[in-house]
C-alpha cells in the first residue's frame, strides 16, 4: 500500500504523458536520407463508418443505432486518430501503419484522404469481412519507403461449425530502401470475452499466423517478417507459445521514461501489453515503444491514468481509443 500511495502521488505531480520519445523522430544520415524504418500498430476502437452494411451486424454504429454514431462523431474520431499518427511520426511520417477495428474501406479512406494525413500520401489495403460486425484490419504505407509488392489476407479456419468467423490476417510484402523484402502481418486475434469457449478459435488464429510465417521463411532467402496487432493475450500467454516455436521473437514494448502508463490496454484496474510486435529474421537495432501523449489519457474514478476512449459502454465519451499504439523502429542496414 505505501508503494501504491507513492506512485499515486507521483502521478498527480507528473503530467499524464511525456513530451518527447527520443528515437521516434526519423533518424537521417549526413546526406539527409532516412536510415531507419518505423512501423506502428494501433487498435483504433470501433472505427465504423456511418453507412449501413447489409452483410454485417453494424446496426449499433449507425446514426439511429444504440451508439448514435453520427457523421460528426465519425469525423471527430478520424481527426483524433490522424493527430496521433502525425505525432507518432514526429519530423517525418511513420513508414508502415497497421490498424485494428476498422470497418470496410470508407473508414480508412476518410482517415488517410480526408484528414491532415492526406498530404502525406499514404496508401492502404483493408481485409474483407469475415467478422460478423464487419471489423477488419488494415495496413497503410508510405510508397517512397515501402514499395508494395503484393498483399493478401488469410481466413482463420473455424474449429467448430457453431463458432462465428473471426477477423482475417493481412499480409503486405514490400521492398524497402535497403533492397530487402519486408513482410508485415497485421492481426487481431479473437476476444477473450468468450472465456475458454473461445480458446480453440484463438489457437486457430495463432496457427494461421505460424503457417504463413513458415511459408515466408521457406520462400525468402533472408526473411524479414514483422507480425503485429492486438493479440488479446499477454506475450507470455501459453496460447502464443507456437509463435516462439515458429522462430518469432517478441519485441518488448518499452514504456517511455516518466510515463504513468503500464502497457497498451487497461482492464480491470491493471495494465497489460496485449498489443504486440514479433519479428523473424535480422532487424538491427529493433526497438518498440508504447506511444503516449497527454491528450490520449484521462483519469478513471480511482484517479489512475487510462486510455481516453471513444465510448464507455454505450455512452459516447469522445476520446481516441481504448488502446495505446506501439511504434517500433529498426536500422535499414541489416
Task: Report the location of each language-model feature.
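Metal-dependent phosphoester-hydrolase catalytic domains
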Residues: 20-31, 211-225, 232-334
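N-terminal, active-site-proximal structural segment of metallo-dependent hydrolase catalytic domains
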Residues: 18-115, 125, 129-135, 207, ...
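Structured beta-strand-rich core segments of catalytic domains in phosphoester-bond hydrolases
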Residues: 102-181, 189
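Catalytic metal-binding/acid-base residues of hydrolase active sites
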Residues: 45, 102-103, 188-190, 231-234, ...
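Active-site-proximal beta-strand elements of phosphoester/diester hydrolases
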Residues: 38-46, 150-152, 181-191
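Active-site environment of divalent metal-dependent phosphoester hydrolases
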Residues: 104-106, 132-134, 192-194, 232-238, ...
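Bacterial Sec-dependent N-terminal signal peptides
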Residues: 1-23
Amino acid at each position: 500500500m505505501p508503494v501504491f500511495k507513492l506512485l499515486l502521488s507521483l502521478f498527480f505531480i507528473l503530467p499524464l504523458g511525456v513530451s518527447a520519445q527520443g528515437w521516434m523522430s526519423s533518424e537521417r544520415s549526413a546526406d539527409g536520407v532516412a536510415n531507419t524504418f518505423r512501423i506502428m500498430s494501433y487498435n483504433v476502437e470501433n472505427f465504423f463508418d456511418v453507412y449501413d452494411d447489409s452483410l454485417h451486424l453494424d446496426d449499433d454504429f449507425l446514426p439511429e443505432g444504440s451508439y448514435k454514431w453520427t457523421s460528426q462523431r465519425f469525423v471527430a474520431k478520424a481527426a483524433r486518430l490522424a493527430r496521433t499518427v502525425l505525432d507518432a511520426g514526429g519530423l517525418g511520417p511513420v513508414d508502415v501503419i497497421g490498424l485494428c477495428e476498422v470497418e470496410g474501406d470508407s473508414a480508412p479512406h476518410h482517415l488517410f484522404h480526408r484528414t491532415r494525413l492526406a498530404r502525406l500520401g499514404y496508401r492502404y489495403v483493408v481485409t474483407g469481412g469475415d467478422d460478423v460486425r464487419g471489423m477488419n484490419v488494415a495496413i497503410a504505407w508510405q510508397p517512397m519507403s515501402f514499395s508494395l509488392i503484393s498483399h493478401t489476407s488469410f481466413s482463420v479456419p473455424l474449429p467448430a461449425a457453431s463458432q462465428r468467423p473471426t477477423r482475417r490476417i493481412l499480409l503486405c510484402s514490400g521492398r524497402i530502401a535497403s533492397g530487402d523484402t519486408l513482410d508485415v502481418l497485421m492481426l487481431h486475434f479473437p476476444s477473450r470475452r468468450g472465456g475458454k469457449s473461445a480458446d480453440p478459435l484463438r489457437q486457430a488464429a495463432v496457427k494461421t499466423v505460424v503457417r504463413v510465417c513458415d511459408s515466408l521463411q521457406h520462400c525468402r532467402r533472408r526473411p524479414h517478417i514483422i507480425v503485429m496487432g492486438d493479440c488479446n493475450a499477454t506475450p507470455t500467454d501459453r496460447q502464443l507459445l507456437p509463435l516462439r516455436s515458429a522462430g518469432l521473437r517478441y519485441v518488448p514494448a518499452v514504456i517511455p521514461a516518466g510515463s504513468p502508463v503500464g502497457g497498451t490496454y487497461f482492464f480491470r484496474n491493471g495494465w497489460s501489453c496485449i498489443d504486440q510486435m514479433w519479428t523473424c529474421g535480422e532487424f538491427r537495432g529493433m526497438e518498440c515503444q508504447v506511444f503516449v501523449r497527454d491528450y490520449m489519457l484521462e483519469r478513471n474514478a480511482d484517479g489512475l491514468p487510462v486510455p481516453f476512449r471513444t465510448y464507455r459502454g454505450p455512452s459516447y465519451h469522445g476520446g481516441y481509443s481504448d488502446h495505446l499504439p506501439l511504434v517500433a523502429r529498426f536500422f535499414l542496414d541489416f
